């Protein structure tokens, strides 16, 4: 009897292991059947281990090895990688509303599923439509003075660091500027975060912004997607609960205070959303509810912080390694804004070389190194069958450095984006902010923010290499596109007279 029971136990165990193995590999034959090449997936984990060498270099390696299209697996989830610009246009633009509306879900996010970057289908369309007027050029012009005051704080803080006579860690300085601008424009909160690191807002926001593709919760959901509804039922979220509660309470309090005080308020994103709630032109059932206002404020913070701080850091490294470009940029700024005049929205638009420098930096270092869309139904795109549930991924970083599309792609050449040349650039090869109806809603705000800071910096400082500067710059292996080591440069005052200090 014991022997029989023992045998049954072993058979049951063996059957369980076989079923478990089949579950862990059931999707892994998809691309092989379709004749699409790619690295060999491992049970359960797929091709995730390949990311250990760095996601961005891995994408470039795959482009060289497999050609225009290849297949990957994040756990059991198939990713079809496409690089053909016509196919990318179909996914991002032509079939956006019908098939490729949504981004990938990264698991339980609580009320943040209402945020414009995360929401899906009709919910996304409604929120996007309501938010779009917030990012018009007219609204950005009104918001520019808010950002300008933080540009003065940036100059003051950088001057104080430079006067210590030591090389400056740029991410710390630009991270503080970025946080000040985003908290000021999305929450209406004034903070000099570099000088007030213990401020509750600063501490909570910094916790929110810590992110890694190798986070245990994210990995568990990638390997076992069926855990998502269980985590949601247990109120476990990708975002720290205490941080989200703090931000939710803060926004609600700020909103209540503003509604009680009838005085004219400055134009910021929070106020514009409050105004839209009370607009007679919007049906009450379509307007943003209070929790949606909170979600949008937080997602603006989450998306805007890294874009600004990292891009400014990359720009300064490139300018320090290309002093001729830095000098030419300073000359353009000095000509259009003599005597350190403050930039206006219209002046920023006129600065052609400034635009070229920023665009070329975003080519080399696009903050979103990949774009993804989920296929909602079986579809044939340009002769390629894409099954329902497949994630279609466009490797932006690899496309931006593809020698088939760029001469000497690893070289920093702002002239690529001159008036004469930029019309030759395919918008479905170069897309640092995405493309189509679901591109980055805050693109113009981000560019204005970056350019305004860059003008203030170039008016007052020159940036030079020092022994601590990593040359050539290497990228880290975490999820976001960031340098391997902090970017450290020598900062020199141009004339000792620093406006705003």
Swiss-Prot record:
Cofactor(s) for this UniProt protein: heme
**Membrane topology term:** Peripheral membrane protein
Tell me which PROSITE patterns the record gives: CYTOCHROME_P450 (PS00086)
Chain sites annotated for binding heme: 440
Where is the protein situated, by its record's location annotation? Endoplasmic reticulum membrane; Microsome membrane
- Assigned EC number: 1.14.14.1
Organism superkingdom: Eukaryota
- What does the UniProt induction comment state? By rifampicin.
Q: Does the keyword Transferase apply?
A: no
Q: Does the keyword field hold Transport? A: no
The record's Pfam families line, in alphabetical order, gives: p450
**Gene Ontology molecular function:** heme binding; iron ion binding; monooxygenase activity; oxidoreductase activity, acting on paired donors, with incorporation or reduction of molecular oxygen, reduced flavin or flavoprotein as one donor, and incorporation of one atom of oxygen; testosterone 6-beta-hydroxylase activity
Q: Which family does it belong to?
A: Belongs to the cytochrome P450 family.
Q: What does this protein do?
A: Exhibits progesterone 6 beta-hydroxylase activity.
Name of the protein described by the UniProt record? Cytochrome P450 3A6
Q: Which organism is it from?
A: Oryctolagus cuniculus (Rabbit)
């Amino acid at each position: 009897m014991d022997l029989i029971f023992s045998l049954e136990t072993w058979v049951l165990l063996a059957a369980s292991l076989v079923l478990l193995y089949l579950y862990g590999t059931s999707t892994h034959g998809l691309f092989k059947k379709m004749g699409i090449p790619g690295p060999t997936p491992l049970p359960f984990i797929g091709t995730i281990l390949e990311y250990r060498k760095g996601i961005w270099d891995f994408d470039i390696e795959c482009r060289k090895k497999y050609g225009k299209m290849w297949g990957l697996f994040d756990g059991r989830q198939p990713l079809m990688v496409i690089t053909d610009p016509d196919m990318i246009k179909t996914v991002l633009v032509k079939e956006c509303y019908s098939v490729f509306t949504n981004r990938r879900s990264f698991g339980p996010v609580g009320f943040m599923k209402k945020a414009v970057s995360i929401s899906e289908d009709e919910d996304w369309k409604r929120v996007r439509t309501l938010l779009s007027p917030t990012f018009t050029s007219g609204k950005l012009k009104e918001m520019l003075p808010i950002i300008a005051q933080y540009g003065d704080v940036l100059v003051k803080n950088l001057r104080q660091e430079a006067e210590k006579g030591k090389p400056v860690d740029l991410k710390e300085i630009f991270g503080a500027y970025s946080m000040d601008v985003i908290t000021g424009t999305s929450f209406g909160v004034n903070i000099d975060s570099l000088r007030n690191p213990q401020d509750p807002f600063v501490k909570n926001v910094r916790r929110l912004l810590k992110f890694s593709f190798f986070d245990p919760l994210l990995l568990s959901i990638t390997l076992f997607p069926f855990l998502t509804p269980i985590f949601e039922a247990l109120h476990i979220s990708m975002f720290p609960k205490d941080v989200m509660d703090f931000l939710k309470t803060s926004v609600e309090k700020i909103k209540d205070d503003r509604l009680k005080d009838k005085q004219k308020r400055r134009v910021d994103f929070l106020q514009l959303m409050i105004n839209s709630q009370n607009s007679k032109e919007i049906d009450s059932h379509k307007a943003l509810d209070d929790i949606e206002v909170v979600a949008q404020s937080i997602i603006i913070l989450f998306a805007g912080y890294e874009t600004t701080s990292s891009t400014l850091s990359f720009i300064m490294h490139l300018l320090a390694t290309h002093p001729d470009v830095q000098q030419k940029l300073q000359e353009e700024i000095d000509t259009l804004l003599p005597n350190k005049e403050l930039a206006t929205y219209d002046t920023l638009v006129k600065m052609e070389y400034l635009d070229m420098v920023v665009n070329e930096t975003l080519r080399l270092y696009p903050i979103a190194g990949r774009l993804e869309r989920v296929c909602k139904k079986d579809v044939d795109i340009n002769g390629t069958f894409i099954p329902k549930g497949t994630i279609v991924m466009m490797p932006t970083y690899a496309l931006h450095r593809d020698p088939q599309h760029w001469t000497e792609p690893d070289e920093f050449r702002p002239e690529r984006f001159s008036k004469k040349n930029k019309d030759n650039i395919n918008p479905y090869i170069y897309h640092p902010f995405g493309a189509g109806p679901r591109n980055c809603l805050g693109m113009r705000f981000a560019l204005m923010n970056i350019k305004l800071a860059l003008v203030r910096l170039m008016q007052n400082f020159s940036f030079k290499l020092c022994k601590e500067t990593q040359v050539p710059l290497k990228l880290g292996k975490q999820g976001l596109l960031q340098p391997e080591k902090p970017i450290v440069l020598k900062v020199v005052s141009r004339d000792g007279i620093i406006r705003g200090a």
